[in-house]
Amino acid sequence: MESKACAKFIRVSPRKARLIASNVKGKTVELAMNILKFTPNKSAGIILGVMRSALANAEHNAKLDVDTLIVKEVIVNEGPTWKRFMPRAQGRATHIRKRSSHISVVLSEGQE
């Protein structure tokens, strides 16, 4: 049985979020949450929040035993990009792309 949660339109770069997501995939939920708690990164806190939501969904909706859950998938997809300009010298401007992410966490019962 699986349980999942997702957060959409999160203002964090997908590339940076994927670095953190790959660290917790395949680990037990308890170990993954400890890794995320002590990772000094904005995306770690966001993934931790989504993981807590998936854990609550598993406990409340699917009635799963939270001690046996593992992190099956952490999917980070690219959301919309906000485009901004930064004024530069001599009347020029450069593009700034403020990227966003859609983050999904899937927990399942099973062995590590």
UniProtKB/Swiss-Prot annotation:
Q: Does the keyword RNA-binding apply?
A: yes
- The answer, when asked if rRNA-binding is one of the entry's keywords, is yes
Question: What InterPro entries does its record include?
Answer: Ribosomal_uL22, Ribosomal_uL22_bac/chlpt-type, Ribosomal_uL22_bac/org-type, Ribosomal_uL22_CS, Ribosomal_uL22_sf
Tell me which domain of life the UniProt entry assigns to the organism this sequence originates from. Answer: Bacteria
List keywords of the entry alphabetically. Answer: Ribonucleoprotein, Ribosomal protein, RNA-binding, rRNA-binding
Query: Which GO BP terms sit in this record?
Result: translation
**Pfam families assigned to the protein according to its UniProt record, in alphabetical order:** Ribosomal_L22
Gene3D superfamilies found in the cross-reference section: Ribosomal protein L22/L17
Which terms in the GO cellular component ontology are assigned? Answer: cytosolic large ribosomal subunit
MF annotations from Gene Ontology:
rRNA binding; structural constituent of ribosome
What interactions and quaternary structure are annotated?
Part of the 50S ribosomal subunit.
Family from the record: Belongs to the universal ribosomal protein uL22 family.
Function, as annotated, reads: This protein binds specifically to 23S rRNA; its binding is stimulated by other ribosomal proteins, e.g. L4, L17, and L20. It is important during the early stages of 50S assembly. It makes multiple contacts with different domains of the 23S rRNA in the assembled 50S subunit and ribosome.
Specify the protein name.
Large ribosomal subunit protein uL22
User: Gene name, please?
Assistant: rplV
